[in-house]
Amino acid sequence: MTQAHLLVLATGGTIAGVAGSALRHDYRPGQIGVDDYLEQVDALGLEARLVGRQIANIGSEDIGAAIWTRLHEEITAAFADPGCQGVIVTHGTDTAEETAFLLDLTLPTTKPVVLVGAMRPADAVGYDGLRNFANAVRVASDPEAAGRGVLVVMGDRVFAARDVRKVRTRGTDAFRGFPRDAVGLVTPSALDWFGAPWRASEGAQYAYHAELPEVPILYVYGGIGADVAARMTSEATRGLVVAGVGEGNMPQPLRAELVRLRESGVAIVRASRLDEGLVDREPEDDANGFVAARALNPQKARILLQVLLANGIDDPAAIQAAFDRR
C-alpha cells in the first residue's frame, strides 16, 4: 500500500497542551510544537508520510481572521501540490466548528481536509489526542473523504463541518452533529462512511476574504432591553445574528429595534440559543426583512453571514436562499 503524503498544519489547542501533572484539571494549551508532536506520532507506525508546519500554538479561543487566512493560504497551496494527498489541521476544540465551517465554505473539495483536536492535554491520564490524530490520518488518507467538504474527527467519529458542534465542556464525547450526526465512524485501522459524498461541485462555494465584515451575535435573555442592540452595533456593523429563545424568538421592543437596524442596511439573521432545532421562516420575517438561520447555530450563522456579505450578497432573499442550502 502506498503511503499517503499528508500536510499537518498545527495551531495549538489541547491536543498540544500540557498540564505538568497527569491528574491536574488546569493546563496550558499549545505547548508542544508540531515537530515534537510528529515524533510521538512516528511511534504509532501510521501508514502515511506526514510533513508538519506550525501555523500557531495557542488556545482556539484566540484564533481569528489572521490564522484563518494563513490556514486558507497553506491549504490552497497544498491543493495545488500534486504530491500532497490531504491536509490535517490540529486545532483547539472551543472554536473548531467555526474554523471548519469557514474553510468548508471557501475551499474546493478536491482533497480531504480534516480538523482534529483533543479534550485532554498530552500528559493527562487517558489522553485522547494521539488516537484522534491517528483517526484523522486514516480519514485524510482515504480518497473517499474528498467531496465531503471539511471534516472534523473527534472520539472515533467523523463529522461534517456544517453539522459539527461542541456540546460539552469536558469528556472525550464532547462533539455531536446536527441536523446530521456523524457521517462516518473511524478507528486507526478502519473507516466506514455513512452515505456518498454530498458536495457535487469540486469548486469552492464562496471566495475567501481575509477581512470579514463586522457581525456580532446578540444573545436574547429574559428581560432584555431593546437598547442592547444599539449598544453592540456601530457604523461598521454589516450584519447581526440573534441567538433567540426557542425558535429564534425575541421581545417585541427588541424586534422593533432590529427592524430599524435592518432598514438602515444591517442584515439580521434569527438563530436559536438552543442546542438543536430548526429556525424556520415566519410570516413576520417577510415584513421585517429578517433571515431564518434554519439548522445553523449562532456562531455558524455568523460565519456564513460574514462570508455572504464579503462576497457582495446582502439582499435578504439571497441570504435566506444560502441559509436554506445548508
Language-model region placement:
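ATP/NTP phosphate-donor binding region
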Residues: 1-78, 256, 276, 313
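Short Gly/Thr/Asp-enriched flexible loops that form oxyanion-binding sites at enzyme active sites
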Residues: 89-111, 250-259
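Internal gly/pro-rich beta-alpha loop/helix module
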Residues: 115-187
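Accessory alpha-helical/coil subdomains and C-terminal extensions
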Residues: 2-5, 9-13, 33-44, 160-239, ...
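ATP/nucleoside-binding phosphotransfer catalytic cores, i.e., glycine-rich phosphate-binding loops
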Residues: 248, 252-326
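A short helix->loop->beta-strand "cap" motif at the edges of active sites that frequently abuts
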Residues: 84, 109-112, 263-268
